[in-house]
């Protein structure tokens, strides 16, 4: 898998974003743009449940598609386990988590995992997480769009 080459890279001090069954190409394009803007190392998606490159995705990525490696993997849980063996902390985003995203230590090797807007992370993927965190949003608002949440998380991790 492409993952092996990227995991072994010396550039792995930056964060990765992992998407679990995010299927909207415009959301993925916007997430690619945010990853590029906030200097994430790579985006990882499951091959089977993620859209292929399309005009809608490229348009939403706004010229940043070539700036970010997109790793397509067969088994997301196993791929996250491989990242953990390479020293990454697997951090799942969960609106009901006790810990706030601002409590994460910056500068480490993080693999931030985000699930689909409807179902969130699948159980097996969530079980690979070392911890889960949430974005502190108004309790009257159920959630954010996944691409918006990704941008906020990447910004928070990129702050000095």
Residues of each region from the PLM?
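Structured adenosyl-cofactor binding patch, chiefly the S-adenosyl-L-methionine
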Residues: 36-37, 58-64, 123-160
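Single conserved hydrophobic/aromatic residue that forms the stacking wall/gate
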Residues: 1-8, 12-13
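Hydrophobic, well-structured mid-protein blocks that either form specific transmembrane helices
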Residues: 14-62
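Short beta->alpha connector loops at strand-helix junctions that form conserved
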Residues: 20, 46-47, 68, 74, ...
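Short, conserved catalytic or interaction motifs in soluble domains
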Residues: 40, 95, 103, 137, ...
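Amphipathic alpha-helical repeat scaffolds
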Residues: 23-31, 75, 144-149
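Histidine/lysine/aspartate-rich catalytic loop segments that bind and position anionic ligands
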Residues: 41-99
